[in-house]
Amino acid sequence: MGELRGAHVPVLLERCLELLSPALDRTGQTGRTVYVDATLGLGGHAEAILTAHPRTMLVGLDRDTEALAHARVRLARFADRVHLEHAVYDELPDVLDRIGHPVVDGILFDLGVSSLQLDAPDRGFAYAQDAPLDMRMDQSRGVTAEEVVNSYSHPELARVLRVYGEEKFASRIASAIVRERDRAPITSSAQLAELVRQAIPAPARRTGGHPAKRTFQALRIEVNRELAALETALPAALDRLAIEGRMVVLSYHSLEDRLTKVALADRVRSKGPIDLPVELPGTGPTFRLLSRGAELPGEAEVAVNPRAASVRLRAAERLDPTQQQRQRTDRERYRRQVRAMHQPGTGSAVRRPVSGDDGTGTDEEGEGHDD
């Protein structure tokens, strides 16, 4: 286990605690709640949750064995409430079934590359450091970035850079990679970063940060199958939340945030026919959004933790179906009273019953209202 460089600052820690705490404060019949950190990393968020909620049990997942080792040390004082697993987040349902916690109360996804991985000089994630082209979050399995850049065809490389890096010079960069590897294999992050810099037109290099940023992001996503795993993991995680359970997702680029937005929007919309006067049982929203769109970090957060600059937070809570049914009944009773009022010979005033704001209203983009 390598030494950590600098202090680890969990991103949007106070906001995550604020959003997850209502779900973790409910102990129910078992006398405890279960919190899943699907991307445990160095355990900063988990430590804060366990400290604030002494009746909460942690299930922590991470594909990086080095991160798990650091987190195990950090969380040692909570050992009787901690269960750590070497797993990717799309394996969450299998993990929960195996350990006997099929339903949980809170889930956090803190996506992207971790501080440990960025700072480790031998992992190859950072374009500012010279290191072997590895980029695997789990160094025990999978292909490396070196294998990708030296074996993928030009069309395959261009697709990866264009789709996962949103790189507009994808084809030019892919051509430069193919030309260079024909002379000698590309083996280091510094070699690749310089190759990308030279492939991008000079005017474009002067804006948008380091020229290799998008290429390194794209290769990392390809190597670790990040988006494919996330697309599977988000709906599966929502399915495992208890009533009034909550999930928070921190994403760091538009592709992650888009998948999160789609997964949540699917659960906060009615599935019933739009032309029916009433909502059919089982077709209403099953979740409500806890944030208005994607929340951004404040200036103070970014000043303390510059790596939080690109974060986008989204959160949702599972609704109680019995409460939803009561609200549907109230709405139907009101409609009947209105119809009766407009019948010949009636003239009594109708007062609409007051129903609680369930926060399920969304626009076409899937955005909701503040909690």
From Swiss-Prot:
EC numbers, comma separated: 2.1.1.199
Molecular function per GO: rRNA (cytosine-N4-)-methyltransferase activity
Question: Does this entry carry the keyword rRNA processing?
Answer: yes
Class of the enzyme per the UniProt entry, highest EC level: transferase
Question: GO cellular component terms?
Answer: cytoplasm
Q: Give residue spans, biased composition: Acidic residues.
A: 360-371
- One of this protein's GO BP terms? rRNA base methylation
**Gene3D superfamilies from the UniProt entry:** Putative methyltransferase TM0872, insert domain, Vaccinia Virus protein VP39
The role this protein plays is:
Specifically methylates the N4 position of cytidine in position 1402 (C1402) of 16S rRNA.
Concerning its family, UniProt says:
Belongs to the methyltransferase superfamily. RsmH family.
The name under which this protein is listed is: Ribosomal RNA small subunit methyltransferase H
Q: Which organism is it from?
A: Salinispora tropica (strain ATCC BAA-916 / DSM 44818 / JCM 13857 / NBRC 105044 / CNB-440)
Query: In the record, what lineage is assigned to the organism producing the protein?
Result: Bacteria, Bacillati, Actinomycetota, Actinomycetes, Micromonosporales
